[in-house]
């Protein structure tokens, strides 16, 4: 198998993606920001390389990508998964809220892709997989800044896919629906039950559901797929 770099890899979807790639034999590195203990435990369990990085800071991303290239030698697959969420009325969103949301959820993918792409282009092979959200497709009340950032990530995916396809690089976006991660920590059991009822398959999604879709897009069998937005949502919002 090849090499993979996963941003936001210490918890939730990212951590499960690290586990899935490592289990398949990929040499894997992942970025984490604040979750030091979780990152080190995951690295010990999987053999993946844990690298501290603030994806909203271009210099931090530059340094972290250089470290990833040092330990992996090259990067075949980049998974831009790092993300944050926040629920707020639109009129209560501060400048800092807005900048932080776009910095992590959108700029982080731009910075990491910019660092990794030259190597992919020179080798004429690469996979970039962005992790968006259903809210980037349909919008979410009280999450305007989050929805806007994820919609931007979809736009980045579609435009970059066209630009780098002649160089052998594919770019796609996974858009999860309601997934059981700590991002749902503010939801009551009743709220979660309602969301499960509103999902046609009758349950919430799991990080494993998303990780398997990411693995599929990383596989050589998906070589003719680029510029696509793939919903992993159990029919929710469709």
PLM features per residue range, with description:
Residues 165, 170, 225-227:
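Short, small/polar-rich loop/turn modules that mediate ligand/substrate recognition or access, typified
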Residues 24-40:
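Conserved glycine-rich Rossmann-like NAD(P)H-binding loop of the short-chain dehydrogenase/reductase
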Residues 10-11:
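Conserved glycine-rich cofactor-binding loop
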Residues 133:
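Residue(s) in the substrate-gating loop at a strand-loop-helix junction
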Residues 113, 149, 157:
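Active-site helix of classical SDR
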Residues 118, 162-163, 223:
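Alpha-helical segment proximal to the catalytic Tyr-Lys
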Residues 84, 91-110, 125, 129, ...:
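Catalytic Tyr-X3-Lys loop
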Residues 89-90, 97-102, 184, 191, ...:
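Substrate-binding pocket helix/loop in short-chain dehydrogenase/reductase
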